[in-house]
């Protein structure tokens, strides 16, 4: 949007400030399927360490006696969310990235940089105050749907920004670099709508010129 205004205007300067100081302007979000096969990690415990065996026993117990949130925070899900988050954060046209990984890393920094176990995460999820959980965790996970949401903003003031190419790059590299199979990550948000509108406008102009 910023390119529609002259650099001397207040709105341009304001949007540039948001871009440079507050992490970007145009929102984009990625919905990632984090479902996994039941007991995938615990299918064969014969060669596992005692610690891993205890983890599998805890998971089995939580599935038997608890709610879905008790066993949702598995290493597979957390690693997948972190991988997508880190990939998006590495892109030069991307500003602020927010996801469950953001919260996890704040917690890990307080926990002597140690990752939490699934059991610890389940306990934290239950014991954290409701208002904090609703504002800082719930927007980024859908337990019943086995989905994680990664929210980000694009740096609109980047001189070489190519929105269509960026969207294509993200869709492609989520599969080739991050390892998310096609169909398990959905890209949406205002940037997608804006890009679609521009592409429709360009196509309409081409057709109009061709008709003339």
Question: Where are the regions that the model predicts?
Answer:
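Extracytoplasmic
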Residues: 1-212
């Amino acid at each position: 949007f910023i390119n529609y205004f002259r650099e001397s205007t207040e709105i341009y300067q304001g949007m540039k400030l948001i871009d440079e100081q507050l992490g970007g302007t145009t929102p984009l979000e990625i919905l990632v399927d984090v479902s996994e096969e039941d007991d995938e990690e615990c299918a064969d415990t014969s060669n596992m360490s005692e610690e891993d065996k205890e983890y599998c026993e805890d998971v089995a117990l939580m599935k038997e006696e608890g709610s879905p949130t008790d066993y949702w925070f598995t290493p597979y899900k957390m690693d997948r969310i972190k991988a997508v988050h880190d990939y998006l954060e590495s892109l030069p046209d991307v500003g602020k990235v927010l996801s469950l990984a953001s919260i996890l890393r704040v917690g890990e920094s307080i926990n002597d940089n140690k990752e939490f176990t699934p059991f610890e995460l389940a306990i934290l999820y239950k014991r954290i105050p409701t208002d904090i959980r609703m504002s800082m965790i719930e927007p980024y996970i859908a337990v019943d749907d086995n989905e994680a949401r990664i929210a980000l903003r694009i740096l609109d003031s980047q001189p070489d920004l190519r929105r269509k190419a960026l969207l294509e790059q993200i869709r492609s590299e989520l599969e080739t670099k991050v390892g998310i199979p096609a169909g398990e990550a959905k890209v949406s948000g205002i940037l997608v709508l804006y890009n679609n509108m521009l592409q429709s406008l360009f196509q309409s102009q081409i057709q109009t010129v061709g008709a003339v």
